[in-house]
C-alpha cells in the first residue's frame, strides 16, 4: 500500500498572489497548442517544451524524443502528455535523476513542471517520500495529474515560470546537478594549476613492460648453401673474344 502524500503548508510566493505588472521583456511567452496551427509554430512549441523540461537552450539531437514529437504534431497526444513523456525519458533520467538526490530532484521537477519553487522543506520531504515509494515515474504522474498543473496549464499549455519578479530564471539558478555531483566529477579528473596534480598523474600512469625472450645463437640453424650436384651442359668461356668475333 502506497504511503499518502504528507501534508505541508504552502508559503507565500509571487505565483500565489494576483499580479498587476505591465508586461515587458521578462514576461514569459506562453505556448499553447491551439495557437500553433502551422508547422513552424508547432516546432517552436516543441522546442519551448524541451527548454522548459531539460533547461537547455540547445537540445542535442541525441536527446530528442522523435516518437513523442510525431504524436504531438498529429494531435494524438496533448501537451501535458508530451511534458510527461519528456520528464520520463531516458535522457532526463540520465542527465537529471541519476545525478541528484531526491530532495534536489523535487526542487528541479517542481520548477520545471509546475513552474514554481518548493514552498518549504516539508514539501521537499513529502515529495521525496513519494519518489521513494512510487518511483520517479509515479512522482511525475502525480505532478502532471495534479490539480495545480491542471489549473495553471491545462492540457495544451507548455509550463513556464509563473510570475517571475526580479528573480533570475530557474534555468540559471538551478543547473542540472548540484555541488555533490560537481565535487564528485572534480575528484575523478585532474585539476590544472597545481604541481601536485602532475605528480599524481605521473604516479597513476601504468607502464607496460615488454618481455623479451632470450635467444641463443647456438640454437639458430644456418641453411646449407653448398651444391651436391655436378653442373651439366657445355661450359661457356667468359672471355668475350671467344664468344664474339672482333672486326
From Swiss-Prot:
InterPro entries per record: PBS_linker_dom, PBS_linker_sf, Phycobilisome
Gene3D superfamilies in UniProt: Phycobilisome linker domain
Pfam families tied to this protein: PBS_linker_poly
Membrane topology, from the record: Peripheral membrane protein
Domain PBS-linker: 11-189
Signal peptide from the UniProt entry: none
Coiled coil: none
Statement: the UniProt record of this protein carries the keyword Thylakoid: yes
Primary residence: membrane
Gene Ontology CC annotation, any one: phycobilisome
Any one GO BP annotation for this protein: photosynthesis
Tree of life domain: Bacteria
Keyword Ribosomal protein: no
Alphabetical UniProt keywords: Antenna complex, Membrane, Photosynthesis, Phycobilisome, Thylakoid
Cell compartments where the protein resides: Cellular thylakoid membrane
Family statement drawn from the similarity comment of this UniProt entry: Belongs to the phycobilisome linker protein family.
Subunit-structure text: The phycobilisome is a hemidiscoidal structure that is composed of two distinct substructures: a core complex and a number of rods radiating from the core.
Function: Rod-core linker protein required for attachment of phycocyanin to allophycocyanin in cores of phycobilisomes. Linker polypeptides determine the state of aggregation and the location of the disk-shaped phycobiliprotein units within the phycobilisome and modulate their spectroscopic properties in order to mediate a directed and optimal energy transfer.
Protein name: Phycobilisome rod-core linker polypeptide CpcG2
Species: Mastigocladus laminosus
Gene expressing this chain: cpcG2
Amino acid at each position: 500500500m502506497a504511503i499518502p502524500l504528507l501534508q505541508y503548508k504552502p508559503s507565500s510566493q509571487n505565483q500565489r498572489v494576483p499580479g498587476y505588472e505591465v508586461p515587458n521583456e521578462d514576461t514569459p511567452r506562453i505556448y499553447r497548442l491551439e495557437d500553433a496551427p502551422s508547422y513552424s509554430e508547432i516546432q517552436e512549441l516543441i522546442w519551448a517544451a524541451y527548454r522548459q523540461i531539460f533547461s537547455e537552450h540547445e537540445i542535442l539531437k541525441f536527446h530528442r524524443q522523435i516518437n513523442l514529437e510525431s504524436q504531438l504534431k498529429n494531435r494524438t497526444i496533448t501537451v501535458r502528455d508530451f511534458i510527461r513523456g519528456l520528464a520520463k525519458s531516458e535522457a532526463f533520467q540520465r542527465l537529471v535523476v541519476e545525478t541528484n538526490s531526491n530532495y534536489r530532484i523535487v526542487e528541479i521537477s517542481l520548477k520545471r513542471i509546475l513552474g514554481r519553487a518548493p514552498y518549504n522543506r516539508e514539501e521537499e520531504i513529502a515529495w521525496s517520500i513519494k519518489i521513494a515509494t512510487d518511483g520517479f515515474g509515479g512522482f511525475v504522474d502525480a505532478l502532471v495529474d495534479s490539480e495545480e498543473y491542471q489549473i495553471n496549464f491545462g492540457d495544451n499549455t507548455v509550463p513556464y515560470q509563473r510570475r517571475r519578479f526580479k528573480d533570475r530564471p530557474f534555468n540559471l539558478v538551478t543547473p542540472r546537478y548540484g555541488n555533490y555531483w560537481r565535487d564528485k566529477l572534480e575528484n575523478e579528473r585532474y585539476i590544472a594549476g597545481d604541481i601536485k596534480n602532475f605528480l599524481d598523474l605521473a604516479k597513476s600512469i601504468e607502464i607496460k613492460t615488454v618481455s623479451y625472450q632470450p635467444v641463443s645463437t647456438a640454437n639458430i640453424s644456418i641453411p646449407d648453401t653448398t651444391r651436391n650436384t655436378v653442373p651439366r651442359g657445355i661450359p661457356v668461356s667468359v672471355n668475350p673474344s671467344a664468344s664474339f668475333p672482333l672486326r
